[in-house]
Amino acid sequence: MIYPATRGLWLRLFLPFAAGYFLSYLYRTANAVIGPVLAHELSLGDNALGLLTSTYFLAFGAAQLPLGMLLDRFGPRRVEAALLVIAASGAAVFALSDALGGLALGRALIGLGVSACLMASFKAFAQWFPPERQASLTGWIMAAGGLGALAAAKPLELALGFASWRTIALGLAAATLAVAAIIWFVAPDKESEEKGTGIFAQLAGVKAIYSSRHFWRYAPMGFWFTGGFMAVQGLWASRWMAVLEGMDGAAIALRLTWMSGAMLAGFLFMGFFATALVHRGIKLEKIYLGAMLVAVGLLSLICTLPNFAGGLLWPLLGICFSLSNVSYSLVAQAFPPALSGRANTALNLLVFAGAFGLQWGIGGLVGALQAAGWTSDAAFRAAFVTLLGGQLLALGWMFLSRRRG
């Protein structure tokens, strides 16, 4: 396969998809800052807030399997542009809602609408760039998401001082429509290898992925680590800081900004150096496993000593989270380019099942323990220790499957 690599292609391909993923990540993490405002204005408890926030992940995850087939059949440009229109409508519904049901519907439409932003980028990169550049490209596109996470922290908190959350949501709806138009009219297209392939043939490809031992080596890690980090970053980190560290909204927003900045640094590291590391014979899987081991250590310290160096531990956890996304490249490299969309969305399904289940589950466990008489501090610690236990089990499975080959 010939891979053109002109500067014009880079600008026309990367920048539109990067803008989409920027918005996707901003939407994903915005509730960490907006959540307390919603809880106060609409009298939402932790359980309701967790459900509201996790509807994004539920809709996002449910879209992944059909999304993989759509990407492989119709291409990333058409699929992402169309879905972003749905995301814009969801932001508008969210902005105009006064009850939990309407807010949840809006978040679900947003989740469905941005469900292709990362996977469409991966598919486009697989079509236009050679395999040895995929890890670096993953780093660059994740850096765009890191910028979105940064925007959803202190800048969003400052914006709430000048405009209501409803006005901000309507502004995001307009920005999302603009990005959809840019992708539709600017991003290049390439004839899909799967065009004309029947639904049963496409499903056979999905079956091959889910039957692969290589895929299941990484699937539990995606659920507990990448999904778990999303659940924590998107909502429960801010609640932990408020309940166990006694931080106010401004301090939490600043901490989240540092955490997002650390994530961005990790993404940029992969963007700059991943291809060079591969050329030097350094296995990305070793970097991935090392980062996840460090993440377990950091979360253990946070759970055990919540008031010890949180300003350092949380940003370091952000760096580890950024490196967890290497798993997408590690999974996809075992499958041909024609299956790249389905391979990445198969893993992403597990990731977002984890994000939804764990985000809602943490809220449900905290609420149940508090109802049973536990203090808020003890309930949150128990929920985070449960997450830590799942991550340790996933690591154990990973090492066991590596030994078996």
State what each model feature region is.
Residues I2-T6, P188-A219:
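Juxtamembrane intracellular "pre-TM" segments in multi-pass secondary transporters
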Residues R12-D46, L67, V232-S238, L358-I362:
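Extracytoplasmic
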Residues N31-A32, R213-M270, L358-G363:
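Extracytoplasmic gate region of multi-pass secondary transporters
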Residues S43, G75, L96-G102, G113, ...:
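Helix-breaking motifs and short loop linkers at transmembrane-helix boundaries and internal kinks
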Residues A62-G101:
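Conserved MFS/SLC helix-loop-helix module at the cytosolic interface between two early adjacent transmembrane helices
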Residues I86, G90, G101-L109, A309-L316:
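Paired small-residue
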Residues G106-A144:
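Cytoplasmic helix-loop-helix junction between adjacent transmembrane helices
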Residues W140-A187:
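Helix-loop-helix hairpin linking two adjacent transmembrane segments in secondary transporters
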